[in-house]
Amino acid sequence: NGILNKQSINILKNNPKVNKGYLPYTSQNLLNSAFKFLNAPYGWGGLKDSVDCSSLLFNVYRTVGIYLPRNADDQETTAGIIVNLLGMSADQRKVQLGASNPGAALAMPNHIMLYLGQVNDEPYAIHSLGSHCANGSRQSVMKVVISDLKLMKSDGNTYLNHLTHACEYR
């Protein structure tokens, strides 16, 4: 009928799941937001209520008021503290990642992940993963997962060795 009505709703003020405005920019808030996507279905371009790697980061950082570009390769070059990992050995990359804050983005060609931290000197990330290689064949995953960076690409190198940059957006 073309009439717009204004409607008020009552939201509990002490509900920890509700925040007025953006959440404070902290590693904990980034990780809490990311973990809400754990096991969500992978879908290229975020089709049909799914998330791909870049939409995961886009959605997580949006909760703290940072609007990232939509695509992983563009997110890699967005303003912030960017650490170049190219040309580093695996051990050097682990040292650099150990100096990064949880919630930093980890970029490699055509993929981006959210850094969680290290366990026994092994870096871990949460990311929306379509597949990886194991025992010489493609392993379908198709969901948001937590993994170390020992996962293999089709060329036989690990995700750790494919990393190009660690990015802390500001």
Where are these regions (language model features)?
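Acidic-enriched, low-complexity/disordered segments with a strong bias for Aspartate over Glutamate
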Residues: 49-52, 73-74, 91, 121, ...
